[in-house]
Regions:
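Active-site acidic/histidine proton-transfer and metal-coordination neighborhood
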Residues: 55-153
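Acidic-and-aromatic substrate-binding clefts and catalytic sites of carbohydrate-active enzymes
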Residues: 6-26, 48-58, 128-136, 161-168, ...
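Acidic (Asp/Glu)-rich catalytic clusters
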Residues: 22-42, 58-73, 110-115, 144-148, ...
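Short, small-residue-biased leader/transition segments that mark boundaries at the very start
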Residues: 1-2
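Gly/Pro-rich active-site loop or hairpin
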Residues: 12-25, 93-102, 163-223, 238
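Active-site beta-loop-alpha junctions enriched in small/polar residues
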Residues: 5-8, 45-48, 79-80, 125-127, ...
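Structural preference for beta-strand elements that scaffold enzyme active sites
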Residues: 37-41, 72-76, 119-123, 152-154, ...
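C-terminal helical cap(s) of enzyme catalytic domains, especially alpha/beta-barrels
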Residues: 238-261
Length: 262
């Protein structure tokens, strides 16, 4: 699967705003063409799980309507998203993996799943903690969340790679402790280097660390439905067609999918 980020088909102006949800007609026409040719999944950034004590039900219902309209096979969203003073500013911060957050997320995820009417996959974000203990804490947290709610996981391998490079977190230990049967989608992407670390922008070639993680984990994910190549819309003109195809074929060979004809 290819994912172009950001891909916005509607805008949420926030709670209490008149005509809160604004649709983009030109983008709707494009997604309708795609829906006639491909199986689709919805990837959201607006539910802001964990950002407050209450789920934004209106936003979840709007997302559900879109998923139903285009027959999306599942809906994915990011975890965690700490929001202070803004409804959907999911990059405002990162939450701690503790019982309070687990309780909040369990309630929100269960409500969201009832509204969405489609399987819900939750994506790992770059962690805010440091050190070896984080891997064990986070894997136990995610296992508890999936077992309690029945939701599944979208494992972003570049975010996991960022944890290793920027935070000193043992990605291998996280994988070894995690229930891999909960993983139904994997994201692979790239990022920018900066002094002392990397940032998650998906702009350049995939780092070898991402490929190593994919090779290590994909064959062990018995319920994996797809691997998604994530790239930003800002790079549309800069993408090298042959290089993209080469990366896709490398991913196919690791996952065990037959090589496509071009």
């Amino acid at each position: 699967m290819l994912f172009r980020s950001p891909e916005r088909f509607w805008t949420d102006r926030g709670r209490g705003a008149p005509a809160r949800f604004r649709h983009a007609p030109e983008d709707i026409a494009r997604i309708e063409r795609l829906a006639g040719q491909f199986r689709l999944a919805a990837h959201s950034v607006g539910l802001a799980f964990g950002g407050s004590a209450f789920l934004d039900v209106a936003h979840a219902r709007e997302l559900s309507a879109w998923a139903e309209r285009y027959g999306c096979e599942w809906v994915s969203e990011h975890l965690p998203g700490v929001v202070e003073g803004h409804d959907h500013a999911t990059d405002a911060g990162l939450a701690a993996w503790n019982d309070d957050l687990l309780s909040t997320l369990t309630e929100q995820v269960e409500i969201a799943q009832d509204i969405l009417g489609a399987p819900l996959l939750l994506e790992n974000r770059e962690d805010s903690g440091r050190g070896a203990a984080v891997a064990a804490t986070r894997s136990a947290f995610l296992d508890a969340l999936t077992q309690t709610t029945g939701c599944r996981l979208l494992l972003d391998l570049h975010n996991l790679h960022l944890d290793t490079v920027n935070r000193g977190i043992d990605g291998d230990a996280f994988i070894d402790r995690l229930d891999l049967d909960s993983i139904e989608e994997i994201h692979i992407g790239a990022g920018d280097c900066f002094v002392g670390g990397r940032v998650d922008t998906s702009d350049d070639g995939f780092p070898e660390g991402v490929w190593r993680l994919l090779q290590r984990i994909a064959p062990r994910c018995r319920k994996l439905r797809c691997v998604t190549f994530e790239f930003p819309a800002s790079r549309d003109r800069a993408l090298d067609h042959d290089a993209v195809l080469a990366q896709i074929e490398r991913a196919r060979s690791i996952v065990g999918v037959p090589t496509a004809r071009h």
